[in-house]
């Protein structure tokens, strides 16, 4: 209601965006100020819920979501393929320097519960068979997986493109140049025809400029 009154009084355009949490915190929000400076007349409402990963939320003007295949009957643009790489905390690496040589034997593994086979797929693509871990920690969201690795709870598979700031800051250490190319991609999605709206067109152009083929 307040936003509606503001729009009526000041002519501000409203844009409702839904983004999965890790993408929002690591990519979108750090760069959003440049969009706001360029389009000060667009008010953005960002929802970071993660309950509709495989569909475009009905209440959203624009969403950024992981899809295995491009959704039909929507205006879609692929941003980049999801790639997973092994990572752990500097402290865990110091305790187990063999990790950098690919030896994960006897170490705790952190598993994203929505991707239960990711470690198996990574092992097959990397070459050596994955040794039995000392324990397995399962977590519901990708950002909680990364946080657990940051806290030294184990070795995790984290999204390569979304974790670059953690690697640069030294809070996570990438353990290998190898990465697992998944079958999923991040897509920018809007309803058919909404791309003609000025605020949707502006946001899409900016997103593609910042994150296309990241």
Labelled PLM ranges:
Residues 27, 195-209:
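Short amphipathic alpha-helical coupling segments at ligand-binding clamshell hinges
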Residues 87-90, 186-196:
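A bilobed periplasmic-binding-protein/Venus flytrap-type ligand-binding module shared by bacterial periplasmic
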Residues 21, 113, 190-193:
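Short loop or secondary-structure boundary microenvironments that flank
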Residues 1-9:
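Alpha-helical linker/hinge and terminal dimerization helices associated
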Residues 16-18, 63, 87, 110, ...:
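Short, well-ordered beta-strand segments
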Residues 8-15, 103-105:
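Immediate post-signal peptide segment of exported/extracytoplasmic ligand-binding proteins
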Residues 57, 69-153, 158-183, 210-214:
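C-terminal regulatory
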Residues 11-72:
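Central regulatory/effector-binding core of bacterial HTH transcription factors
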